[in-house]
Amino acid sequence: MAIPYRTRRTIRRALTVCLVVAVLLVTVCLCGMIWVQRYIVYAADGSVRIDFDLPPLTMGNTARPPQRLDITINIEETNQNPDFTGELTQLGGFYIEPETLTDIPAVLEQLKELPAGTPIMVDVKSIRGDFYYSSSVSSRRSNTVNTEDMDNLIAYLKDSGLYVIARVPAFRDYAHGLENVSDGVYHSSGGYLHMDAQGCYWLNPAREGNISYLTKIITELRTLGFHEVMLTDFSFPESNNILVNGDRQEILTKAANILLTACGNDSFAVSFEMTENFTAPEGRSRIYRSGLTATEAEQAFQNSTLPNPAVNLVFLTELFDTRFDAFSVLRPLMGAY
């Protein structure tokens, strides 16, 4: 049935009136909510209440912008050519991971971010007897490290203002042991050289030829601009099946003193990566320890008989435990970024 026109018109007017009333009610509610917000109190316990007894807000003076303070900050410029002579100081720096030497240009980019005076350690020779740089001591070169790139790296380090440390395997050298059999460490059964689990021959620390060989390497590194050399594998092989004529620790202590006397001076240190049982030579030298936890490092520091463990005892670690920061410590360069 069709709705008459008059009825439809009446309904339309009624709906229009209802819509207008609804809009007015919504507007009044919104205005009321805005007005009542000034009386809303948020309690510390998270509850909310309305308090109409709050005093009305008063208009104050226009807030002034904060006064600008002219503060002079004195920034001491970093000395690009720091003096590394005199007493040794505590180290806090980095070592270049050997595997990253396959991309020396990338290593150089990282080094350029370091401030002058930062200690940096780099490997210059492998346990196979390969030299990473253009050495005059030996013609053996690495197949994995580009010699020209390594020469450029060493040249950069020399003029960088960084404190540069060369890491060198001392008595673990496959090629030199093979070429100088009489100076090697022999198996206890006699007649042949001892070979370790990694297939390397070891050099006898008691042999003058080996001390002379190391002296030449260290002296060359000193002339290339290094401030310190750190000798790893400064020991006999960890085996009871080798021939040793004499006390092992006495032989190593004597070798360390000879090398320090021959190569060390007031601007160049000869250091050793050793265990806690090694007696360090007196002079410009440090003892390096690696593979320790922070707790073990704290114990090693407390038990150290070195004259100044904060300076003469250095930890090599991949850990970023802040307890290491109280000591001399070197961490991976890759971890600096």
Give residue spans per PLM region.
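Hydrophobic membrane-insertion alpha-helices, especially the h-region
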Residues: 16-34
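Substrate-binding cleft of secreted/luminal carbohydrate-active enzymes
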Residues: 32-47, 284-337
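Catalytic domains of carbohydrate-active enzymes, especially glycoside hydrolases
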Residues: 105-131, 220-230, 284-287
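Glycine-rich, aromatic-flanked loop segments that form ligand/cofactor-binding clefts
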Residues: 119, 145, 149-194
